[in-house]
Amino acid sequence: MREKLTKSDVEKIQAEIDHRKLVERKELIEAVKEARSHGDLSENFEYHAAKKEKNRNESRIRYLERMLKTAIIVEDH
């Protein structure tokens, strides 16, 4: 189902996408690198947690981008 969004909604969603891409993505990549440097990945909880959080961020970006791509823009009330 296509979401009905106002221009304000679109701006908020785009701001979240930008923040996730420009800020959170970089921080999460660094967290993965840092955790990876701690050695054995098979028992490295920090590494697996960092990867999971990075993947969650990427999933949210894809979801929001898809929402914007398919949205129906309505007038602000």
Residue ranges and their predicted role:
Residues 1-18, 22-56, 61:
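N-terminal cationic and glycine-rich segments that engage phosphates or anionic surfaces
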